[in-house]
């Protein structure tokens, strides 16, 4: 994985979107994009190459949109170090739709992109279990499905499969429940964050990696795991699931 220091220009460019969204939003963006290996992995592996219409389920304050737009800007710059030399070109988004159940996160996202009318992004407040999904070439679900019960998890995945065209892509991050101590640590951290943000207990419905892959196959996808630990102690896995 690319050293975090090499990503400083990209992280700064993405975090700059949040200068109008408040100090917390901008600081959170900078820390999250610097230390969470999922964002770098998406670009380093080129998993969204050629995907122009993106649907982000459980988008939070829109970090993925900021990351991808900043990536395109950095890639087109001539300045040395603006883009990691070994990375493939980033995707060029024609449209991005993020759906988020937390109204405060949606408000931050909308404020962040309000000064960039050229960015083809929209943020919808609602529940991914209920809202209609717009047309997309790729759907991204990062650290979201384990907040839903098992029946809802499958229902969302089947709806995603129906919404995607042939050769469509689903990109998911999950925690491998068979990962031993790393999983226990990650789950404890997740529960703490949820309690701090939501002020209530939320049950987590996790699965082992093999069970996630089996479920995806049952829902019409062919999935493979991508390396993503990035030096962290957790057992998170990025799943690249193509329409079978």
Pin down the residues of each PLM region:
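Conserved class I S-adenosyl-L-methionine
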Residues: 52-60
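A short glycine-rich, Lys/Arg-flanked "PGG" loop and its adjoining helix->strand segment in the class I
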Residues: 154-166
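A conserved beta-strand element that flanks and buttresses the S-adenosyl-L-methionine
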Residues: 140
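Class I (Rossmann-like) S-adenosyl-L-methionine-dependent methyltransferase catalytic domain
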Residues: 2-45, 61-132, 151, 171-244
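Short conserved AdoMet
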Residues: 47-49, 165
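Local beta-strand N-terminus motif with an aromatic residue
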Residues: 136-137
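Short catalytic micro-motifs in class I SAM-dependent methyltransferases
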Residues: 143-144
